[in-house]
UniProtKB/Swiss-Prot annotation:
Participates in transcription elongation, termination and antitermination. SMART domains: KOW (SM00739), NGN (SM00738). Pfam families: KOW, NusG. Belongs to the NusG family. Keywords: Transcription, Transcription antitermination, Transcription regulation, Transcription termination. PANTHER family: RHO-INTERACTING TRANSCRIPTION TERMINATION FACTOR NUSG, TRANSCRIPTION TERMINATION_ANTITERMINATION PROTEIN NUSG. The gene is nusG. InterPro entries: KOW, NGN, NGN-like_dom, NGN_dom_sf, NusG-like, Rib_uL2_dom2, Transcrpt_antiterm_NusG, Transcrpt_antiterm_NusG_bac_CS. Residues 131-161 form the KOW domain. The lineage of its organism: Bacteria, Pseudomonadati, Pseudomonadota, Gammaproteobacteria, Vibrionales. This is Transcription termination/antitermination protein NusG.
């Protein structure tokens, strides 16, 4: 007796900006065609990010892989055609056009772990690095430029070295109080 084929993760390319609709349409097509046994999860990996706008903390979602949808499925002709028939699907990534290759279990685990971590706490939308020059846009040091010395993502705070009267002075600021200089 042969073992049932295992569901593997495949990457489907969708029109950018339509990933959510493609995932929803795919779920509906699977149900409509009664092919639930061939499919597992359909994911658009996102993380919640926080940004400061006009002094307000705003949460939004950012896609890990814009333009891509992850589909857990058993690949055969029927499942391949079902995915390809969904509107705004451009095709599979990896392998050949008629025989797509799944991502490795290691890659799938890394993505799923990243999703799990992303659901625990929102990340800042803007990432800062030590040595980067920023402009302070709020508080007593508004309109001063400074160099990032330390970044604390847990507390969403920065230590910025601001030049005041010719002396470098370390200042603790929140992410929303500074902006990157281009």
């Amino acid at each position: 007796m042969s073992e049932a084929p295992k569901k593997r993760w495949y990457v489907v390319q969708a029109f950018s900006g339509f990933e959510g609709r493609v995932a929803q349409s795919l779920r509906e097509h699977i149900k409509m065609h009664g092919m639930e046994e061939l499919f597992g999860e359909v994911l658009v990996p996102t993380e919640e990010v926080v940004e400061m706008r006009a002094g307000q903390r705003r949460k939004s979602e950012r896609k890990f892989f814009p333009g891509y949808v992850l589909v857990q499925m058993i690949m055969n002709d029927e499942s391949w055609h079902l995915v390809r028939s969904v509107p705004r699907v451009m095709g599979f990534i990896g392998g050949t056009s008629d025989r797509p290759a799944p991502i490795t279990d290691k890659e799938a685990d890394a993505i799923l772990n990243r999703l799990e971590k992303a659901s625990e706490a929102p990340r800042p939308k803007t990432m800062f690095e030590a040595g980067e020059v920023v402009r302070v846009n709020d508080g007593p040091f508004a309109d001063f430029n400074g160099t990032v010395e330390e970044v604390d993502y847990e507390k969403s705070r920065l230590k910025v070295s601001v030049s005041i009267f010719g002396r470098a002075t370390p200042v603790e600021l929140e992410f929303g109080q500074v902006e990157k200089l281009d």
